[in-house]
Amino acid sequence: PYWYRVDPKSWSPDNPGEYTLERLNSSGSEYISQSGIGRGADNTFYFHGQLNYENTFGEDHGVTAMLMYMQREYRNDVLPNRNQGLSGRLTYAFRQKYLAEFNFGYNGTERLDKGKRFEFFPAMSLGWVVSSEKFWQPLEKYVDYFKVRGSYGLVGSDETGSYDGAAHFLYVNNVNLGGGGSYSTGPTYSSIYKKGPSINSYAVQNAHWERVKKMDIGVDMKLFNQVDITFDYFCDKRDRILMRRASWPALLGYVSATPWSNIGKVENKGIELGVNWKKEVFKGFHVDFRGNFTYTENKYIDKDEPAYPYVWQTETGKPLSRTTGYIAEGLFRSQEEIDDSPAQDGIGSAKLMPGDIKYRDVNGDGKITEDDKVMISPYGTMPRIQYGL
């Protein structure tokens, strides 16, 4: 910053309220900048209170209930992360054969504007222990336990956009007082140099919680009193994902401060299989074998994108971790073939020679550029199949 002192020649005890400031340093700024403050420790404050209820009515009806209040503050930087919420669970079982469960969460976050900080997230699940029915008795020697279940509910997240550079407080502007253009005033030997403000990110006052609509259908069974098998089909539809408005043209002047909005939608679905075999080979000695298998796939349902010139450049409807690249059409056989093919000087630094890879000119403009990249694999770096023993 600039440093000043009172010019002793300009001050008089007869008029002490009038004086002239004399600048001491020749360069500086009219504001004080503050860089990030490093921390060598994290701390968490967590408080929760919980009430539980459990009762059985007669021999057929069982009820349990839980109500919990939670308050959390996590600090690993100058600004802490604060959350508050109320959650509950109610379960009902009829003869331990027909099962129902209702859960809810009423959660709040400081990241959103007033009126949008709290949201309600309910969930419901049903189960049927088929092996408890009388008609199952002939099968008990093969299948000791068989249960079908299903659930559907909403889950919320306030971390939306935080890993992609969104501000902590989404509802306020993030301003850098010295990040804008600059100007100088005054004579050359004592000019005043100033920089204007710049906007790092604009306030998103209508931001909401990110949501996931989760659906699961599963089966639990036990075979020959030794093998436990669990199978699930799941489908998660995530919406209100906070993303920058990529469709807004640069001529609007936002540059790196393009506004954020809850516009993203992603679908993730798949199956999970778990097998556990346990047997007592002889007294005191057990053999335990566990295995699992998971298959998942995902895609963008909706994503705000620029006005790409070619349809193959869009991401909506495609997997998140897909691989893009050029389509290889073989190898160049001669220099004559190189001369007659679309120019691909922009790929690699070496001069093309016979034996180099020949790429397809997808858009037909006579040269190989970034516009010729297409999705060459839907799998990418994230495996769809995972398994373990």
What are these regions (language model features)?
Residues 28-37, 72-73, 105-109, 130-135, ...:
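Extracytoplasmic loops and strand-loop junctions of Gram-negative outer membrane beta-barrel proteins
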Residues 137-211, 230-266:
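Solvent-exposed loop/turn elements at secondary-structure boundaries
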Residues 1-48, 60, 64, 74-75, ...:
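Surface-exposed, low-complexity loop segments enriched in small/polar and acidic residues
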Residues 162-165, 169-171, 181, 280-381:
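Conserved small-residue
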Residues 1, 45-72, 81-113, 117-134, ...:
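Surface-exposed extracellular loop regions of Gram-negative outer-membrane beta-barrel proteins
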Residues 1-9, 78-86, 117-123, 165-175, ...:
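Flexible, surface-exposed loop regions and adjacent strand-edge segments
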Residues 79, 177-228, 257-282, 317-324, ...:
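Outer-membrane beta-barrel signature, preferentially recognizing the C-terminal barrel domain
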